[in-house]
């Protein structure tokens, strides 16, 4: 995996803050996502090896938390609340408007990469 040297140093330093290596999984995932923008499958494998875990244990964390991205995202990231109260006030219509305006679907990157 091609991580910046400062990210690698930060990862090594973060691990020392935890009495059990596996406790550092969230921090490592955050550091990698900050560096490369998302968490590809090789990042999951790399973190698992680094923390002496099974890859499935890391993948569970990646898929559980919505702040982790498994695919590259555009330069701009638009979020629309879709809870019950927001849905009742038209959140899904707002989503449809964004999809039409940017020629994309929810979770995709627009054709211009923005």
Model region roles, listed by residue range:
Residues 1-114:
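Signature of N-terminal electron-transfer/Fe-S-associated modules in redox systems
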